[in-house]
Amino acid sequence: MKKLFGTDGVRGVANVYPMTTEMAMQLGRAAAYIFKSSSKRRHRIVIGKDTRLSGYMLENAMVAGICSMGVDVLLVGPLPTPGIANITSSMRADAGVVISASHNPFQDNGIKFFSADGFKLPDQIELKIEKLIESNKIDSLRPTASEVGKAFRIDDAAGRYIVFLKNTFPTEMDLSGMKIVLDCANGAAYRVAPAVFEELGAEVICLGVSPNGTNINADCGSLYPQVISEAVKKHRADIGIALDGDADRVIVCDEFGHEVDGDHIMAICATDMLRRKLLKKKTLVTTVMSNMGLDIAMRAAGGKIVKTAVGDRYVVEEMRKGGYNLGGEQSGHMIFLDSNTTGDGILSALQLLAVMRRTEKPLSELSEVMIALPQVLVNTRVREKKDITTIPEIAARIRDVEEKLGNEGRVLIRYSGTEPLLRVMLEGKDTYEITAWANEIIDLVRKHLGEKQ
């Protein structure tokens, strides 16, 4: 059972356990030990980060830990998470490290790893790293003299990633004549994303491109789609694109300012790939959080859906296991496995823009491929993550609601993998009813598991 690693690496408040410099150094040492093979060549690990103030101290601690084990470090600076995955594989490094807490506020930070092929580490490798740290087994391993590692800065990392992204866009197309509102959340994509869309010919109105270390995700980015919505209407743009702090997810809005979430983007791209016979096994991989409307849209187009637990890592695992090439989450994580190994907000936006260009249809019209069932999501903070089915009062209320919904809706209860939160999601035909039921369930959760005041 992993203790340090959650569903997306190690995460917490910066400078508070486990997100301390001491732990970052230990993670660096343990990871370096595991990724070193028996070969005599020098080993290299890529380290990138987002724009958080705490990124500097954690980066330096990781560098110290890795170099102390005789492994070199390639520093790429602020770069989107998928860019770090891409650089890791393209530079034939042994592993990649991302220092980011994604969509969380600036006070938080996180550390996650990619293996040499650019995919997130499997659970068993993360468990090995944890056990090494707990056992103190490698404390005595101290390379000396010329055996210690050194750090290099890769100055053209952003440029390499920009070229990679542009090459995923159809060569016979460009974005000339399109007006795009782009919100980079004052995060890792603040330089890369504007360059990609501008170099493809679009007129880009940029928001969230002035990071100062404390404004990442602050009233901007994919968690605040109303920002691009207002800007699209003001500038009469064709589309609004909002990334999160590490740019592994994207939310967009159409030319009228209406939000288009990950489910709709997947529906648009998957049905387009079905038409062009490019969707492997005619299958889209999603999570249990995706709206039932997506299932209906895929069936109508002649495709099918495979569902996983929540978390893009589980989507990717299912895609690799089943031989599928498109998957994602309602939150905006989308994986185009023919192009990249992990969720990529900029790449996903480019694929959506390609469908708009190919069909010569506005986003509002393309979005009609899917009609979402009313969905309500309510969160509450909890003091412990106890199995809900063991609390009779809550379990009975959930069963009662499920009986009332029948085959025309569903109840989904799950804990966040990265925060002390419980999420209650209901789908059904009547928004008023499902909202009331969701609030009833959440009130019972607060009664039994809520944080003590």
Swiss-Prot record:
Active site location: 102 (phosphoserine intermediate)
Entry keyword set: Isomerase, Magnesium, Metal-binding, Phosphoprotein
GO cellular component: cytosol
Listed GO MF terms: magnesium ion binding; phosphoglucosamine mutase activity; phosphomannomutase activity
Residues annotated as binding Mg(2+): 102, 244, 246, 248
Family: Belongs to the phosphohexose mutase family.
Protein name as annotated: Phosphoglucosamine mutase
